[in-house]
A protein has these predicted regions:
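Nucleotide 5′-phosphate-binding alpha/beta core
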Residues: 1-104, 108, 185
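Conserved AMP-binding loop of ANL adenylate-forming enzymes
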Residues: 104-137
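AMP-binding (ANL) adenylation modules
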Residues: 32, 119, 268-272
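Short, flexible loop segments at the rims of nucleotide/cofactor-binding pockets, characterized by
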Residues: 89-92, 117, 138-142
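Hydrophobic alpha-helical segments that mediate membrane insertion or helix-helix packing
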Residues: 81-82, 113, 132, 243
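Active-site glycine/GP-rich loop and adjacent strand/helix microenvironment
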Residues: 1-17, 135-272
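Conserved ATP-dependent adenylate/AMP-binding module captured primarily in the ANL superfamily
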Residues: 98-112, 147-159
Length: 272
């Protein structure tokens, strides 16, 4: 890949249009030439496909609606989102970018990671699992639920990092300490899913109460990791992603600002 992300996006989108008739039809209808992408302004002309429309296209032309730009034999997994929408995933190292989050959090060789995200149909569990392995950590594939059993696992295996929703992390930590005592709690790192409300205040309380550092990322089933925390304020955008903040009605790029209801549009560097 080149050092110019826009050049790589142009090459990838041009190649994809020759392999995916659904994508080519959308480009043609919008008068969009992917080979001419060289800036963020060019990406702003890219026709956006909403999930609702993709669902209809997949029902009419299963399984992927004409948008698969790879040889079917190269598809490693097919994830399923509500609808259902089928999302093909090629084999990707590092959990499609989640290894960057683990590295930022200081998780690596010698750590025991309890991964409580779902492992079936959706990508969360598998991507986190792959990323933890990529940085050299040992993974316990806990999955969803079984609080008492997972609390015992934490106490008896010396788990040092937990990947979980905020609510489930709290349930696990309380169960471990109440059942096995504070000395059984060896967890130092928590990679948490977000919650409504003042989530940052809740995280600060978790850090103080349970002696952990908390970390988070922004990701989707389609792209994997988009941005992640690195210890400073805010999020760092994955180096292979271009993120736009757009007005959902007009599609125009807007400056970030508090109190606005906007949407993210993300383009990714890829090899085809």
């Amino acid at each position: 890949m080149s050092s110019d992300i826009y050049q790589d996006i142009a090459s990838a989108y041009s190649a994809a249009a020759t392999k995916a008739p659904g994508l080519k039809a959308r480009f043609d209808a919008a008068g969009f030439d992917p080979a001419r992408v060289s800036s963020l302004a060019d990406l702003s002309r890219l026709p956006v496909l909403k999930k609702e429309e993709l669902l209809k296209l997949q029902r009419a032309n299963p399984p992927f609606g004409g948008f698969l730009a790879a040889d079917p034999k190269d598809v490693a997994r097919i994830y399923v989102s509500p609808g259902p929408i089928f999302e093909p995933a090629l084999q990707g190292g590092g959990g499609h970018g989640f290894d960057l989050l683990f590295q930022a959090a200081g998780v690596g060789a010698g750590d025991v990671v309890l991964n409580t995200w779902m492992y079936h149909l959706v990508p969360a569990g598998l991507l986190i699992d792959e990323a933890a392995h990529a940085v050299g950590a040992t993974v316990i594939p806990g999955g969803v639920g079984n609080r008492e059993l997972q609390a015992q696992i934490i106490a008896e295996t010396g788990v040092t990092a937990i990947c979980a929703s905020t609510a489930f992390f709290l349930a696990l930590s309380e169960t471990v300490i109440n059942t096995y005592g504070r000395d059984a709690w060896k967890v130092k790192t928590a990679l948490l899913g977000g919650e409504m409300g003042d989530w940052m205040a809740k995280r600060r309380k978790i850090e103080a109460d349970y002696g952990v550092s908390t970390w988070a990322a922004y990701a989707t089933a389609d792209l994997g990791l988009i941005a992640y925390e690195d210890g400073d304020e805010g999020y760092v955008v994955h180096p292979d992603r271009v993120v736009q903040i757009c007005d959902p009605a007009s599609g125009d790029s807007v400056a970030p600002g508090a109190g606005q209801s906007n949407e993210f549009r993300v383009a990714a560097r890829a090899e085809l």
